[in-house]
Amino acid sequence: MEPRNFDTLRDHLTKDFIWPSVYMFKFIAPADNRIFALLHDLFPHQAEFTNRHSAGGKYVSITVKEMMLSAEEVIDRYEKASAIEGVIVL
């Protein structure tokens, strides 16, 4: 899998957010407990998870809210999540 370029997101986060800030991460993944567990392990237990299954039940959208200290922390989390096979970062 080719590494995703997060430069545009980095610019947006640097210009439009005041850090620290609560950031809302969004992902889409197959409805697979293993993938969800891997994604869940990237975040501390204080992070707030919301899941919504697709109509057919094959996929789940995952929203995570967490207090982040910097744009670089957000980018780092997205890079780690994008390395999980099947996870789409939004």
Regions found by a protein language model. Give the residues of each.
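Long, contiguous binding/interaction regions
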Residues: 1-61, 67-90
